[in-house]
Design a protein with these regions (language model features):
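Proline- and acidic/polar-enriched loop/turn elements at helix boundaries
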Residues: 47, 91, 117, 128-129, ...
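Signature tryptophan residues that serve as conserved aromatic anchors
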Residues: 41, 83-86, 178, 187
């Protein structure tokens, strides 16, 4: 089954829990980020890159591609293709994926918070709060299947019943701001995908690492 997540800007995969082996003091990160399109890590063909700095040392911790129009359109087409199967996946099956995602985020809050501190400069306590507030929405998504059930009102008029159906919208997209790099993306794509939509996520170009690892966890749930 294809996971309906297509990140326009993300981090190349490395080993470890959720795809990373990280120590806070000397975090090893790649020189350039990659895109995720159709569930695959893809190098950008752009020749324009944005440096992401550690605010404590001014060290460049990664470079973010200014993703091309063609790459964006490729992500859209991929999301359209994934929607055909994902929208027909049962709500219970989508719920099981969200349960696994919730557990992976919860188990790696500390590591995700370190990435926020590395690239944004928040204290670890603030960074953990950033992740935790996003996790709360993911936990809500786990119970959202009860809200996806249609309903039927009988006898609304003579010989008339009124059924209601809840169906996915299609391909959705979100652009995340810089100030809460974990929390706000976790407000966006989990809610859309649990409802059967596919999603194109564009995280802030200033803070890539935590979004990348959070979405590695999502890809790992398949």
């Amino acid at each position: 089954m294809m996971i309906p997540l297509h990140l326009l800007r993300s981090l190349e995969p490395v080993t470890g829990v959720c795809g990373r082996s990280l120590s806070y003091a000397g975090a090893r990160v790649p020189a350039k980020t990659q895109n995720i399109i159709n569930g695959q890590w893809v190098d950008s063909s752009t020749d324009r890159w944005i440096d992401v700095h550690n605010p404590a040392t001014n060290e460049v911790v990664t470079q973010v591609p200014q993703t091309t129009q063609a790459e964006m359109e490729q992500a859209v087409e991929s999301a359209k293709g994934a929607f055909r199967s994902w929208s027909k996946t049962s709500a219970m099956a989508r719920q099981q994926i969200m349960f696994r995602y919730q557990q992976l985020i919860k188990s790696n809050i500390g590591e995700l918070a370190k990435l926020i501190t590395l690239e944004q400069g928040k204290t670890l306590a603030d960074a953990e709060g950033d992740v935790m507030r996003g996790l709360q929405v993911v936990e809500h998504c786990c119970s959202n299947t009860n809200l996806l059930i249609g309903e039927t009102m009988t006898g609304v008029s003579k010989d008339m019943d009124l059924p209601a159906f809840r169906t996915p919208l299609g391909v959705c997209a979100g652009i995340a701001p810089f100030n809460f790099p974990a929390m706000i993306p976790l407000w966006m794509f989990p809610m859309a995908t649990i409802c059967g939509n596919t999603y194109i996520m564009k995280p802030s170009e200033r803070y890539q690492l935590v979004d990348s690892d959070a979405n590695k966890c999502y890809l790992a749930t398949s």
